[in-house]
Structures are given as C-alpha cells and as structure tokens.
Design a protein with these regions (language model features):
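Conserved Rossmann-fold dehydrogenase catalytic segment
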Residues: 1-2, 25-55, 73-91, 96, ...
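Generic secondary-structure signature for well-ordered alpha-helical cores
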Residues: 9, 18-29, 51-54, 58, ...
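Long, well-ordered alpha/beta core segments of mature domains
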Residues: 118-120, 126-137, 143-152, 171-172, ...
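A SIS-like phosphosugar-recognition module
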Residues: 132, 145, 152-155, 166-172, ...
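Rossmann-like NAD(P)(H) cofactor-binding subdomain of soluble oxidoreductases
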Residues: 1-9, 13
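Short acidic alpha-helix initiation/capping motifs at coil-to-helix transition points
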Residues: 56-59, 121-128, 199
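Extracellular and organelle-lumenal recognition/adhesion modules and their flexible linkers in secreted
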Residues: 62
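Small-residue helix-packing motif on alpha-helices
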Residues: 13-16, 79, 144
Length: 230
C-alpha cells in the first residue's frame, strides 16, 4: 500500500482516519503509514517533498547502476545480486528492491528487459514543484534539483547522440575511464549512495521545516519520517 499524508482540517481527520489507514502501507509492527500531517495544505506539501526526494533516490540509483555497469564487468544478473544484497542493509527500500527485480527480469527470448528500454525519463511535475518551492524558501534542495535536471537531460536524445559521436568515451582529462571496480570499490559505491540519500533527506526535511515555520503548520518530523519508512 501507499504512504498517505492527509492534511486539512483536524476535525475532519477522525471521519476519514480508519478508511485511509486501512489502505495505507503497514510497518513491521502493523502501524499504518498514514497520519494527519497538519492544517491547510500541509499534507500536499509534505507529499510533494516526499516525491521530490523520490526523484533524487531514483537518480542516485541510476548513477550507482551506471557506475557498476561500466566498471565491474558484471551482467544484469550480477548487478541485480548487488542491489539485492544492498537491500538487506541500511539501503533497504522499495526502490532498491524493485531495482534488483528489474535487473534480473528477462523476456521470453532470454534478453534482459532493461537492455531494451530507452534511457529517457519523464516526470509528472512534483520534483519540479519541490525545486520551485525550495527556490521560493531560499533553501538548498541541490540533490533533487540535479535529479530533475538529469531527467531534462535524458529527454535530449538527439543532442546526446551527437555528443557521443563527437566526444567518444575514453579519457576524461588524464583520468583513465576504464578502471575496474573490485569488492572494496563496489562497497564504496554503496557507501556513497547511502551518504547521498542522507543528504537528500536532510535537505528535504530542511525545506519542510522552513515551510512549516512560515505557514504555522507545526509539522511533526518524527511522524513524517515514520510513515515514509515504507
């Protein structure tokens, strides 16, 4: 189920609480990932930031995958095993879990499905809205911002294809571009992914804090973190 972030009048919360909590995702202890967030548009705002952070998470996973794909020599099954292992630790999340499944998935002819998917990412707007909100608040939401721009960049297919012909891969300055990652290198990628996720969440919560102070929402960040766990 989903993580649900209702806002609005607190007097309406008891009328819809049971309905919303019954369809929400559940934590290991059975508690629902759904609580009243705050008055007015607090719920919508927190959901927007949640989706913005998710944009960041997906970009981080994509960059980690790209680095592993180019530097380990592993096929998609091997890469899927790495993400499956990562999902057993601090990186445990829905996105890491489905990344492993996607990497393992094969079509009927034995081809990896992922290898036939165009590297273009669309968007529904919540990532962009989060970045716009951060600009309005004067708060640095740098990681989500770069994730949104990466999606814009992915849509420039013709430009990227021309650039790849004009500037073929090989060396970047004096740095060799074909260094193979060993076990410790793979672990370093995992650590970098984890650190970047922490930065993204810290920036997201900072943005919510500023908006809460300006709008008088009195957001409960502990509750928000709890219902985001799934």
């Amino acid at each position: 189920g989903p993580s649900i972030m209702p806002g609005g009048s607190v007097t309406a919360w008891p009328l819809v609480k049971d309905i919303l909590q019954s369809i929400a995702a559940k934590l290991e202890d059975g508690s629902p990932c759904c609580e009243w967030i705050g008055p007015g548009g607090a719920g919508h705002y927190v959901k927007m930031v949640h989706n913005g952070i998710e944009y960041g998470d997906m970009e981080l996973i994509a960059e980690a995958y790209s680095m592993l794909k180019k530097r380990t020599g592993l096929d998609n099954d091997g890469l899927g095993d790495i993400f499956e292992l990562w999902n057993r630790g601090e990186l445990n999340s829905f996105l890491i879990e489905i990344t492993s499944h996607i990497l393992h998935y094969k079509e009927e002819n034995g081809d990896y499905l992922l290898d036939h998917i165009l590297d273009v990412a669309g968007q529904k707007g919540t990532g962009k809205w989060s970045v716009m909100a951060a600009l309005d608040e004067g708060d640095p939401l740098t990681l989500v911002s770069e994730a949104v721009f990466a999606r814009f960049m992915s849509s420039l297919v013709n430009e990227r294809e021309r650039a790849s012909v004009q500037y073929p891969s090989g060396k970047v300055g004096d740095m060799e571009a074909c260094i193979t990652l060993n076990t410790s290198g793979i672990e370093a990628v995992r650590d970098a992914l984890y650190a970047a996720k922490l930065i993204s969440y810290a920036q997201g919560f900072s943005l919510m804090r500023r908006a809460s102070e300006r709008n008088g929402w009195n957001l409960d960040y502990g509750t928000i973190a709890k219902i985001w766990r799934k």
